[in-house]
């Protein structure tokens, strides 16, 4: 955990790939962040794209690209932008909580928020979120973050509570997904799918077209 934006809030990095990568050469990073001051400037991430989802609260973003336009962000909405784009965040609620996927342009990401109640299912049933068509990815990462409530992993005899995260890598599964059952009485979860390019891959920046 560390502060961001000169005390604008706290950021919690949960996962990066590769796990041994430095702050400038990872392919993708997943984190959560609080937004706690009325107005702040987002941290810049040159050579990356940002996929920002507001989970709780609401903000207004001033985005400076060839002039200024404004994006209103309500709870649950998704906001994608270039990591080197100046973005000013203005709270429209007392505070906000968000998830961030910061990734190289050749990495594809997709996410959603689900409310689960009184269910039991195999983990592989959960991991059905469609990705970008015709993706060249050969490696998928699934991230499940518990926003509220709890999830029980029956075959693992463990329980995930608020703030816990499950990472499943399709090349080296940490769970036997076809046999691993999750169950819950009530939970709200964040689920992301990350499609990584075919190996050999490079973590160095690649050019992308500007709008």
Where are these regions (language model features)?
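Jelly-roll (double-stranded beta-helix
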Residues: 1-211
